Amino acid sequence: MTADQLQSIIRAGLACEHLTVEGDGRHWYATIVSAEFEGKRLLARQRLVYATLGDRIKTDEVHALSMKTHTPAEWANALSE
């Protein structure tokens, strides 16, 4: 799997205002900004992202995904710091 493929999968299941994915083909790091994270705690946000991946995690197609999840307001604050 490539970073572009993983981005496409996440975007297909989650409305993202910003998304970056980097990695080596098995271990991935993503920064995801979505209004769908509003009012949700970290674990709920991660579950939303994992839901977009479906069985790709279980089948080891995506071995590991580290992520930072932000609402648009949180992202704007992070950029202004």
Residue ranges of predicted features:
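N-proximal, solvent-exposed amphipathic alpha-helical segments enriched in charged/polar residues
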Residues: 1-16
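Short, non-transmembrane amphipathic alpha-helical segments
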Residues: 6, 10, 45-60
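Short edge beta-strands and adjacent turn/loop segments
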Residues: 13-29
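Residue-level signature for short turns and capping positions that connect secondary-structure elements
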Residues: 26, 35-37, 72
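Histidine-centered active-site/metal-ligand motif
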Residues: 27, 46, 63
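A short interface-forming secondary-structure element
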Residues: 32-46
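C-terminal structural segments of small proteins and small subunits
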Residues: 51-81
